Amino acid sequence: MNVILVLVVLFFAGDCAKIRKIIDFLEKDAPNDIEKTPNYNEESLAVKRNKNFNPCLENPKICSNRGKCLHENGNFYCICPVTHYGKTCEHVSDQTNCEKHLCQNNSTCVSIKSLRTIVNTVLLRQIRVQRKVNGSKAALTNEELAEIDLEVNYECICQKGYFGGLCDESEADRTCQEVYCLGRGKGAINATGKCECECENQFFGDRCEQISACFDTQCDNGGICEDVVDWKTKTVTATCKCPSAIELIGGTVTGENCETLQIPSTAPKEFIPCAEGSNSTMFFKKFIANISLEYMDDISELEAIKNDYNDGKNVNGTMTDGWCRNDGKCVPEVVRVNSSRAYYIYRCECTNPLTDGYYCEYKRHDSCSLTREEVARGDRWDEKCTDSQHGACVDISGVAHCVCKPDYTGEKCEIFDPCARQPCKHGDCIPIPNTADVAFGTSRYQCLCPLSAKLNPESQACMEINEKKCAPGACGNGRCVPCESDADDLMPLCNDNDNRQGFRCLCEAGYLPPFCKVHTNPCYQNLCQNSATCHIDPKQRSYDCQCVNGTRGSLCENVDDSCDAFGNKICVHGTCINDEYFHRGFSCECDDGFEGLDCNVEIAWSSVMTNRLMKNYEFSLPLVACFVSLAILLPVIVISRRRQGRVEEAKKTSEVKTENP
C-alpha cells in the first residue's frame, strides 16, 4: 500500500516519468543471492571465488628449505633448490650418485639404489639437428645408439612445467610434438622458439591441416601425383604425371596411375633387374658405371640405395648374392630420383612380417623386437608396453601383445588401475586418484568390505569372517554372520541373544528371524521406498515394488519427478514445481486465497486482492492511481460546479433587479 500512496502523490504532482521509472525498476530481475544459492559444486565455486587468493602472501614460509613460492588460481607450488624436492620442498635429496647427472631445467637429482636405463634425449636431439643440417636420413649407427642409451642410478624430479626422464621437455615441447601438427607430421621448436611442422606426404600447411587431393592416389613407376585445379567448377582432382623417358634403357610409362611399363626388346640385359643369373651387386655395379658423370647427384643417390643394407650387424653393407634376403620378392619398377630423371631398378617386397629393410635384410627375432625404423628413432624394446615397470611384450602367434603387471591395463599397459587385479577379493575396490597424496609404499586403493567380510590389516583385502560358529543350515533361508566384532563398533550387528549363540541370521525376504526358517508374507519388513506398493511374487518367494509415478528402481529408490511422485498430492491449492534446490525436491506455488509451504493456509479476501494487485502491478497500479484520482477529483468538480451555478444564479437575480428598479 505504501507503493500505491507514493504513486498517487507522484501522479498528482504531475511527475508521470517517475511513475514509469518505478514500474521499470519493479520489472527488473531480482539479483541472485549468491550466499543463499545452494552449492552443488563446491570445488569449482571455490576456485572461482578464490582465484585471486595468494597463499604465498598469507604464509610466506609455506615453501621450506629456501624454496620459492608461486601461486596460480588460488593454489601454490614451490620451486625447490636442487638439494630438495616435494610439495613444500620438505624432502632432502640424496646426492650420492648425482655428481655427473644430466637432469635439466633446475630439476632435482635424487639417488636410487638400482640402475635404470634412460635415453639421453638431449644428445639424441643434438644428433637429429645435425643430421637435418647435413641432409642425412640414414639410420642411427651402433655407436650413436650406445651413446644414447644410459644406465644411471638416479632420478630427476622435475620442476612445474617440465617432463621427461631428464626433465628436458617443456609443456611447449610436448604440445609441439604431440598436438600442434594434428598427427600429420612431426613438430619441433626452432631457434626462434616457434613450433615448426615437418608434414607427412600429402599434407601441407603451417600445421599440416590441409589435405592434398593426391592423399588416396598412388602413382606407380616413378609417377608424380599433382593437384589439378578447375577454377570454373572450383574442384581439385589428382593426376599422375608419368616419366617421359627412362634412362639407359629407354621405354615408356603410361596409364592413369602410370601402371603400364613397356621395355624395348633392344634394352641391354645387364640393365634389367631381377633377371636370372644375375644379382644385386652385379646389377648396380654395371648400372651405375654407365651413368654419365655429369649426373653425379644421381650416382650418389643410387649408391645410397645400393648401400642401404642394415641387418642389425652389418651396417651400410651391400648384397653379396641374390636380389633380396629372407624370401623377399624382387619387384622391378621405375624410380624417379631427386633430379626428376627416371631409372629402371627394383625393390624387395618382404613376405615375412618379421622382416623389413630395402632388401628385407633386417629380421626380427619376434614381433616384440624393434623394427629398423624404431631402432633409428631411438626407441627401446622395453618401451613397447610403456616401460618395463608397466608390462612386458610377448609374441603370440606372430603378433605382439602386452602382458601388464599388476595395477596396469590398456593396450600398452599405459593405464594405471590398482583395482584391475581385484585385490579386495570379497569386497569392492575404490581406486585412489594419482593426484591424492599417499604415504610411500602404501596401496593406491581402498577396500570396502561387506557384512560377511572384514579388512585384513596385513593384506588390506577383504577376508571372509570366521564362520566356524555358523553351522551349515543354521540360518535356513538367510546368511549367517558371526558376532565377532571389534569393541569399538558404534552399531554392533548382534544383540545379547545373538552374542550368546555366537551368530546372527540375516533373513531373505519372506522369512522370519531369528533363524529364517519360518515362511511369512514376503512383504513383511519390505524395503520399498517412496510410497511404493509391495507385491508378492509367489514364484520367486519374494516381492516386487510397484513404484508411483515419478519414481523408479528395483526398490523405487530413485525420484525423477518429485511433483508427479508427491508434490501434486500435497499442493492441493496450488501448482507443484520441481525444485532441486528444495530439500524435498519440489515447492508449491499457491492459488489466490491460499498461502503456506503446502498452500494449505486460507487467507482473507482483502489480502487476496492486495496480492492480485501486486502480482499485476504494471496494470493495476496505474488503474488504482486513476480510480483514486477520480475519487478525489469528483467531489471537487461537483462542489466547483455547484458554486459556479450559485454565482450565475446570483448574477441573474442582480440583473433583474437592475432592470426593474
UniProtKB/Swiss-Prot annotation:
Keywords (A to Z) from UniProt: Cell adhesion, Cytoplasm, Disulfide bond, EGF-like domain, Fertilization, Glycoprotein, Membrane, Repeat, Signal, Transmembrane, Transmembrane helix
Cystine bridges: 56-69, 63-78, 80-89, 214-225, 219-240, 242-258, 385-402, 393-404, 413-419, 523-534, 528-545, 547-556, 563-576, 571-588, 590-599
Bilayer topology: Single-pass type I membrane protein
Tissue: Expressed in spermatids, during spermogenesis expression is primarily localized to the pseudopod.
Signal peptide from the UniProt entry: 1-16
Protein name, as recorded: Sperm transmembrane protein 9
Species per Swiss-Prot/TrEMBL record: Caenorhabditis elegans
UniProt domain EGF-like: residue ranges: 52-90, 210-259, 377-414, 519-557, 559-600
Extracellular side: 17-618
Position of sequence motif Cell attachment site: 377-379
GO biological process: cell adhesion; single fertilization
Note: Removing the EGF-like repeats in any combination completely abolishes fertilization. Modifying each EGF repeat by changing a central cysteine residue to a tyrosine disrupts the secondary structure as the specific disulfide bridges responsible for this overall structure are not formed. The cysteine to tyrosine mutation when located in EGF-like domains 1,3,4 and 5, causes a complete loss of function. The same mutation in additional EGF-like domains leads to a temperature sensitive sterile phenotype.
Topology, Cytoplasmic side: 640-661
